């Protein structure tokens, strides 16, 4: 993978760059739609590629390990071929999903023993087998195995967990070097900064991760319930220490405003289930604020869903029609809302890139944050 830093904003730490992999160019800042089990929920690959048009999507190691299982993916020739996707894929390591199981997992130095949420069977993830699983999935960007701590988190626990994540990172790197590629494209490996909401721990972790010398770096353990200001403070501390000449990925973030604020702090890559999950519940994001399409006020509003027309659904359907689809629990309503929200998120990060390159990102961001902080 090759990272080219094209321009840095003069008023903030925002950057415009490109990542080049064997599956194409990723223009940053970028939002990555979440395709947990090998699909972005409710979206055909044709719509995803032609209308939403992301350079990269995310898939989940934990879920793909359980279903369809790794032998099926290997027989298919990897996830790209299995899901008929010829652009970039990033896989997370399963650390966050294991964290979210809480009552059904046991964390030890060796790894994590957990109970499947599907059938109750017991499995173990270690730094070594997670690297092997991600080789078999075949994503372009793969993540280190880490422990994601909850919020709030006791300082001593956060410190012990961070050091274990660092030891796991060393094991990931050692094993990855011994594990050959399974397919005809290369894979880039990103370690993950942890440390909960403690600045000293975040600094320690960022220094350790920076010294690992990986091709890119990620920040984990945020967007787990902490206030936005704490998230920004941790991102700020970490971005001061991570190398400028490598991409920075903030995992699991966030709202449109979160994304713009973190771009200003120096983040290049984002993923989050919010645009798809909220869409399925009738919440739409727009440049002028959010819309709860289930509200009665939209029942006779025949204006387009979004007059900006970012994706085809925005001008083909009215708010009244979409409200009707949700009222009768029609699946099409969830699909329309999902395409709209993902299209908006991709538009937002592309606009951020455009304004970084133009040199007026700070002014544009301030306007957009104020404009989007609104319920329509």
Predicted regions and their residues:
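Short, solvent-exposed loop/turn segments at secondary-structure junctions
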Residues: 33, 63-65, 96-97, 149-150, ...
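C-terminal extensions of enzymes
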Residues: 1-20, 26-32, 41-42, 146-153, ...
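Conserved, mostly hydrophobic/aromatic
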Residues: 24, 57, 92, 134, ...
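Glycine- and acidic
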Residues: 151-155, 159, 216-222, 331-334
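Non-catalytic, usually N-terminal nucleic-acid engagement modules in DNA/RNA processing proteins
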Residues: 1-182, 296-299
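A non-catalytic, amphipathic alpha-helix used as a structural packing/dimerization or gating element
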Residues: 129, 133, 137, 160, ...
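Glycine-rich phosphate/ribose-binding loops and adjacent secondary-structure elements
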Residues: 175, 179, 184-305
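Structural signal for hydrophobic packing residues in well-ordered secondary-structure cores
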Residues: 138, 169, 173-176, 180, ...
